[in-house]
A protein has these predicted regions:
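Active-site-lining helix/loop region of Rossmann-like oxidoreductase modules
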Residues: 9, 48-51, 62, 69-76, ...
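N-terminal glycine-/serine-/threonine-rich beta1-alpha1-beta2 phosphate-ribose binding loop
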Residues: 1-145, 233-238, 275, 284
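Rossmann-fold NAD(P)-binding glycine/threonine-rich loop
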Residues: 136-151, 159-180
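Short glycine/serine/threonine/alanine-rich loop segments
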Residues: 127, 153-154, 179, 208
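Short catalytic-loop micro-motif centered on adjacent basic/acidic residues
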Residues: 130-132, 156-159, 182-185, 212-213
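Rossmann-fold dehydrogenase core element
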Residues: 173-186, 207, 211
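NAD(P)-dependent Rossmann-like dehydrogenase/reductase catalytic/cofactor-binding core
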Residues: 302-360
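Gly/Ser/Thr-rich loops at beta-strand to alpha-helix junctions
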Residues: 10-16, 134-140, 160-166, 187-193, ...
Length: 360
């Protein structure tokens, strides 16, 4: 059985949780129900088969460090779940482009080292999958790394809300190159998006007409600080909104009746996120029915529990010679896939893909 050789772009909290998670679950029993994992064994790949072989960042406090040290450096503030041994992987200087917004530049020091040749590193390290963890709003940078993946013939997992897999232009590029992509915008295990989607669909399935809804999110990590720069938020708001409204198939709720997005930065929350969600509808006899809930999560482990499957799905697609969007994995693991399915249907499609019963 082979390994899944992974390169990381952006060694922030999400990368920290992913790297720790692979170590934490390395001895998990494939036959057991393990808290925190949807699949201990994903096809032929166990969690321990994920191997980190390259990492890129632009933060002066991370570039040059071993990956095991960089995940705890600079502004990273997620919860520690285990110790990580020396990885033997030095974080290299990536390309900044539009990856650093105003608040990042106010907070971190950009590395003065020269950027490395990303494509050459991907080839030299024989990378299978490149996972993109760049900050929200990194449109140019995300597309740059997507092109690097294509040029190096490396599968691409797009964890941020820049529309790549979901656009015809980029989907065609990946398809023509024979390179798989899983995207766009990671949907956490049990986060605001997945719970909001489920509740919206529950209203509809039970005969309650959803009239309006909102989702407000606050957090204390660099992701939330970066999103104080509202100019970088357009794709994020679109991604989170369409993830929920896609569950209402027979009508448009109207722009004024849906408000979904990040709201504020609260430093003392660290990597925790608090989501406040409200749904208002009409039930039997046109009587009002309202649901309001609060979700508290550690944001980055919540993401890692899904990325850990997305990486293996991308590797399986690469093994099978599939190019372009992996629709099953994208629809279940991402907020803005090329095709939106109901979550139970998307999950079934993933299981079929693992078994080889569905091409993509």
């Amino acid at each position: 059985m082979g390994s899944v050789r992974v390169a990381i772009v952006g060694v922030g909290n999400c990368a920290a949780s992913l790297v720790q998670g692979v170590e934490f679950y390395k001895d998990a029993d494939p036959e057991s129900r393990v808290p925190g994992l949807m699949h201990v064994q994903f096809g032929e790949y166990h969690v321990r088969d994920i191997e980190f072989v390259a990492a890129f960042d632009v933060d002066a406090k991370k570039v040059g460090l071993d990956l095991s040290e960089a995940i705890g450096a600079s502004e990273n503030n997620t919860i520690k779940i285990c110790d990580v041994p020396d990885a033997g992987v030095t974080v290299q200087r990536g390309h900044t482009l539009d990856g650093l917004g105003k608040y990042y530049r106010m907070t971190i020091e950009e590395s003065e080292q020269a950027p490395v040749d990303i494509v050459q590193v991907l080839k030299d390290k024989q990378v299978d999958v490149l996972v993109c963890y760049l900050p929200v709003g990194s449109e140019e940078a995300a597309k740059y790394y997507a092109q690097c993946a294509i040029d190096a013939k490396v599968a691409f997992v797009n964890a941020l809300p820049v529309f790549i897999a979901g656009t015809k232009e980029w989907a065609d590029k990946f398809t023509e190159a024979g390179v798989p992509i899983v995207g766009d915008d990671i949907k956490s295990q049990v986060g605001a998006t997945i719970t909001h989607r489920v509740m919206a669909k529950l209203f509809e399935d039970r005969g309650v007409v959803l009239d309006r809804t909102m989702q407000l999110n606050v957090g204390g990590n660099m992701d939330f600080k970066n999103m104080l720069e509202r100019e970088r938020l357009e794709s994020k708001k679109i991604s989170k909104t369409q993830a929920v409204t896609s569950q209402i198939r027979d009508r448009d709720l109207g722009e004024d009746n849906v408000h979904i997005g990040p709201s504020d930065f609260v430093a003392w929350l660290d990597d925790r996120k608090w989501a406040y969600v409200r749904l208002e509808g009409r039930a039997f006899g046109d009587v009002p029915l309202n649901l309001e809930y609060k979700l508290e999560v550690w944001d980055s482990p919540n993401s890692a529990g899904v990325i850990i499957d997305a990486l293996r799905a991308a590797k399986i697609a690469k093994d099978r010679g599939i190019g372009g969007p992996v629709l099953s994995a994208s629809s279940y693991f991402m907020k803005s896939p090329p095709v939106q399915y109901f979550d139970d249907e998307a999950r079934d499609n993933v299981e079929k893909f693992i078994k080889g019963e569905a091409e993509r």
